[in-house]
């Protein structure tokens, strides 16, 4: 009989993975989870269980523990905090040694942090609230293929946000009629038009036909306006091979930008496409379709600030972030937080905006924040005040819903934007004087006047579901 060299039995997670005196290292990957434990499971045990199951642990002692250095590789729960206004949940702060993760692989990081641990019976609900990616890891990630400044240089557009429009109806148009709508919007004054997230290659409009008619529209609009124009050609496809085929065809046609649904398509496919864009000088617009499945429940899932961080790491030049003022979910302070995460080189911890950690991006370029969803000309002063210049404002229905047509809708948005930028540069307070600014601009723009009349009663005043914790406001 073999001699006994270790103590068998079910593990007490707290004994191994709870270390309140742990000294955090610069190279550690830090995560904070909102944990709702099962009745009878205390906080320290639940936090330690999350640390174990998301790193080196299993439910029982195994003899192969003797063949590795557990102290070096294990995750450590080092702090718990109350969740303001919630008597059941708490925050668990966990430090992971960087050697647990493959360099530059968000796929690998997420497989640990939001993998099997989310089905662990010791917790009733679990939400990944924030992650501090150490600079050691950030430097191994590709980041945005181009970044804000390079995109401005490619498009020759400075000193203001960019204007876009999602072509509507999103499904059902023929390729030729789709191209016509693109031309009218770009000719009217927009910088970009866009495929919607579920426009791929359906029977009513195959992708190759769409690409050709859209590029014809872009070239015509550029010739007539003297401005650089673009359209987000969605290359999302059933397979990576098909995705690259579509991207290559867009490049052959001379498209400046393509688009990808980074969550539904998968992180592996997305990071590969971002690398392709970098190698081929192509701008990359990112749609976040499916994000609310992951981030809207305030107790279980992944917060959007984490999805923002991983997109910047994997690569994207523009990302939908919500609008605050439109029809989609988005608390103002939280939105301001993840806008900064997308654009700035260094972000300090700020609980009032939901930021649990400092985040150093090193030399990694930032990306444009995209405001889209239920916005129209009356929102322009607030949008410019909230987002600043390094953003894209996309008016879908707020362009194509204009009573005089697509070109008039585009012209109204362009006039409204330029009026607000001028007022901002003169030192006026946009959110206080917005109505006056727009009304004055409308005197010389019948398109803007008609748009203001059309949407003067349109508001989206539903309360936000996923709010910052009350004590952090």
UniProtKB/Swiss-Prot annotation:
The basic functional RuBisCO is composed of a large chain homodimer in a 'head-to-tail' conformation. In form I RuBisCO this homodimer is arranged in a barrel-like tetramer with the small subunits forming a tetrameric 'cap' on each end of the 'barrel'. The active site is at 168 (proton acceptor), 287 (proton acceptor). Its EC number is 4.1.1.39. This is Ribulose bisphosphate carboxylase large chain. GO terms for biological process: reductive pentose-phosphate cycle. Its cofactor is Mg(2+). RuBisCO catalyzes two reactions: the carboxylation of D-ribulose 1,5-bisphosphate, the primary event in carbon dioxide fixation, as well as the oxidative fragmentation of the pentose substrate. Both reactions occur simultaneously and in competition at the same active site. PANTHER family: RIBULOSE BISPHOSPHATE CARBOXYLASE, RIBULOSE BISPHOSPHATE CARBOXYLASE LARGE CHAIN. Disulfide bonds: none annotated. Keywords: Calvin cycle, Carbon dioxide fixation, Lyase, Magnesium, Metal-binding, Monooxygenase, Oxidoreductase. The record marks 327 as: Transition state stabilizer. It catalyses: 2 (2R)-3-phosphoglycerate + 2 H(+) = D-ribulose 1,5-bisphosphate + CO2 + H2O; D-ribulose 1,5-bisphosphate + O2 = 2-phosphoglycolate + (2R)-3-phosphoglycerate + 2 H(+). The modification N6-carboxylysine is found at residue 194. Gene3D superfamilies: Ribulose bisphosphate carboxylase, large subunit, C-terminal domain, RuBisCO large subunit, N-terminal domain. Substrate binds at residues 116, 166, 170, 288, 320, 372. Mg(2+) binds at residues 194, 196-197. InterPro entries: RuBisCO (IPR033966), RuBisCo_large_chain_AS (IPR020878), RuBisCO_lsu_C (IPR000685), RuBisCO_lsu_C_sf (IPR036376), RuBisCO_lsu_fd_N (IPR017443), RuBisCO_lsu_N_sf (IPR036422), RuBisCO_lsuI (IPR020888). Heterohexadecamer of 8 large chains and 8 small chains. PROSITE patterns: RUBISCO_LARGE. Binds 1 Mg(2+) ion per subunit. Pfam families: RuBisCO_large, RuBisCO_large_N. Belongs to the RuBisCO large chain family. Type I subfamily. Transmembrane segments: none annotated. It comes from Halorhodospira halophila (strain DSM 244 / SL1). GO terms for molecular function: magnesium ion binding; monooxygenase activity; ribulose-bisphosphate carboxylase activity. It comes from the Bacteria.
């Amino acid at each position: 009989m073999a001699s006994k060299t270790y103590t068998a039995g079910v593990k007490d997670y707290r004994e191994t993975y709870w270390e309140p005196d742990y000294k955090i290292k610069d190279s550690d990957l830090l995560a904070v989870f909102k944990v709702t434990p099962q009745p009878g499971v205390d906080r320290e045990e639940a936090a330690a269980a999350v640390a174990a199951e998301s790193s080196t642990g299993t439910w029982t002692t195994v003899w192969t523990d003797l063949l590795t250095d557990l102290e070096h590789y294990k995750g450590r729960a080092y702090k718990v905090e109350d969740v303001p206004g919630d008597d059941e949940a708490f925050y668990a702060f966990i430090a992971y040694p960087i050697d647990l993760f493959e360099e530059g692989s968000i796929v690998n990081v997420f497989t640990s942090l939001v993998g099997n641990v989310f089905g662990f019976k010791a917790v009733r609900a679990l939400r990944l609230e924030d992650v501090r990616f150490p600079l050691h890891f950030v430097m191994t990630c590709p980041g945005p293929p181009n970044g804000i400044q390079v995109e401005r240089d490619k498009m020759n557009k400075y000193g203001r946000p960019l204007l876009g429009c999602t072509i509507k109806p999103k499904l059902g148009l023929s390729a030729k009629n789709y191209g016509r709508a693109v031309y009218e919007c770009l000719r009217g004054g927009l910088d970009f038009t866009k495929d919607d997230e579920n426009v791929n290659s359906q029977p009513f409009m195959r992708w190759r036909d769409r690409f050709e008619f859209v590029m014809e529209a872009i070239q015509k609009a550029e010739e007539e306006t003297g401005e650089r124009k673009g359209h987000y050609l969605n290359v999302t496809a059933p397979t990576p091979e098909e995705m690259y085929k579509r991207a290559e065809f867009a490049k052959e046609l001379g498209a400046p930008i393509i688009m990808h649904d980074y969550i539904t398509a998968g992180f592996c496919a997305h990071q590969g496409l971002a690398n392709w864009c970098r190698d081929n000088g192509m701008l990359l617009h990112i749609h976040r379709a499916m994000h609310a499945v992951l981030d809207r429940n305030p107790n279980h899932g992944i917060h959007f600030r984490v999805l923002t961080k991983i997109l910047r790491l994997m690569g994207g030049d523009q990302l939908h972030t919500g609008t605050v003022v439109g029809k989609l979910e988005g608390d103002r302070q939280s939105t301001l937080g993840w806008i900064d995460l997308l654009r700035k080189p260094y972000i300090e911890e700020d609980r009032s905006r939901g930021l649990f950690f400092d985040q150093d991006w090193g030399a990694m370029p930032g990306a444009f924040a995209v405001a889209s969803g239920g916005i129209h000309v009356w929102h322009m002063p607030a949008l410019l005040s909230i987002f600043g210049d390094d953003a894209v404002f996309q008016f879908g229905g707020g362009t194509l819903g204009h009573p005089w047509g697509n070109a008039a809708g585009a012209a109204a948005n362009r006039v409204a934007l330029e009026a607000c930028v001028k007022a901002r540069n003169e030192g006026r307070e946009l959110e206080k004087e917005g109505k006056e600014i727009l009304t004055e601009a409308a005197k010389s723009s019948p398109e803007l006047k008609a748009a203001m009349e059309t949407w003067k009663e349109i508001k989206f005043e539903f309360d936000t579901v996923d709010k910052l914790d009350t004590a952090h406001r």
